[in-house]
Amino acid sequence: MALTRLLLPISILWFCFYSSHTILQKDPLLICVNGDPGFDQRAYPTYFGPILDEFSSIMGFEPSILSLERFNPVGGPETSPDTDISVDDFGARGDGTDDTKAFEKAWKDACSSGSVLIVPENKNYLLKQITFSGPCKSDLRVKIRGTIEASSDQSDWVGHNRKRWIEFEDISNLTLEGGGTSNGNGETWWDSSCKRKKSLPCKSAPTALTFRSCKNLIVSDLSIKDSQKMHLSFDKCQDVIASNLMVTAPEHSPNTDGIHITGTQRIHVMNSVIGTGDDCISIESGSKMVIATNITCGPGHGISIGSLGDRNSEAHVSGVLVDGGNLFDTTNGLRIKTWQGGSGSAKNIKFQNIVMHNVTNPIIIDQYYCDSKDPCPEQESAVKVSNVAYMNIRGTSASEVAVKFDCSKSSPCQGYIVGNINLVGNGGKETTMSCSNIVQGLLREGLSTFLFMKRRVHECSY
């Protein structure tokens, strides 16, 4: 049963990529052409051919690439012994006193022995900044059943890494689960943020849970709330499943991204509810083969790729699929954001089967993103955005412009499919689509294809 339960997410992960690729190959506008007899995909073979080839190169890989090593019965790593240890066995009290040392001792034992590490239920464990490092002896399972809390006193962070609260690094074959809660007690950090009080200097604040350079990782069935800054970060990880997560913070808590993905390859975020003061999911440079399915988002800033290219940096993101979800009262829906002056690419991206509920900017590409106190200067270079598809997206927009593509003049967007988009204003008001600086064609020739509210759109300019 345990093996079956663990294999299920892998099967779902492969199915999502395979089914998306198969449908796109057969007819990328299959849903939206119903009721639009004037549109015939076959009339645009030079357009669809290259974009399908590009998507195939990302989505057409073998299933074995997505298999976590721990599930490979031949030559796989040693399995963990059936032994449980509790942090209480190492002196943790769970009564609000500092349990950091006890957790460090418990981790050292579990990492060296392969035992299952338990954080007992019905207790509140106070932790200061802590890093759980590998490599470990074998597969490792951590079950958080109780509550882990951060100190709300910022003086406790003196001499520690202010950018991270709980960090897991250089670990392979780790499962973190259990139904418990991580509470960052972030209120004091939010109150001292320059985003909330413009007169204050901007200082770093901790991310609640960071996974850095981890491989074959499962994070599931956890509640993560009120982080000091970002809630959950995957940094330079490979082969990750994040499922059944509840991530929450108040709407006006600054920089509290729900799930942050950077430099990470082959990750599937699924069946999760995220509502924070910033992006529900943010995908940044170095990330490839990212899937997000069945996501409930709101409040927050939506699901974002970026920001990319800040401080004239080079950034690359490719192979992103967002499939299925609901966004409630977010400031943005599906967003790609890049800074002027950057370089690199964001490509082979597909958003589909999303429902918007009173979302201010349901679909937006902003290549003039500027999150700065001072105006950002005009710059020539830009991150190249190409091969992007938006399919079967409906619901209500809080603004008249429901779809906005504000692409770079110097590096225009290239290769777009927008189909079966049905976004109306509150009360059924009609919405519009705005786009600028999109190349009329994909890579070589042909027409970019836009179907908005079941109508062909021709007014995109370049």
UniProtKB/Swiss-Prot annotation:
Its EC number is 3.2.1.15. Its main location: secreted. GO terms for cellular component: extracellular region. Gene3D superfamilies: Single-stranded right-handed beta-helix, Pectin lyase-like (2.160.20.10). It comes from the Eukaryota. Coiled coil: none annotated. Residues 1-22 form the signal peptide. It is an enzyme of class 3 (hydrolase). It is found in: Secreted; Secreted, Cell wall. Glycans are attached at N173, N294, N358. Keywords: Cell wall, Cell wall biogenesis/degradation, Disulfide bond, Fruit ripening, Glycoprotein, Glycosidase, Hydrolase, Repeat, Secreted, Signal. It comes from Persea americana (Avocado). Acts in concert with the pectinesterase, in the ripening process. Is involved in cell wall metabolism, specifically in polyuronide degradation. This is Polygalacturonase. The active site is at D278 (proton donor), H301. One of its GO terms (molecular function) is polygalacturonase activity. InterPro entries: Glyco_hydro_28, Pectin_lyas_fold, Pectin_lyase_fold/virulence.
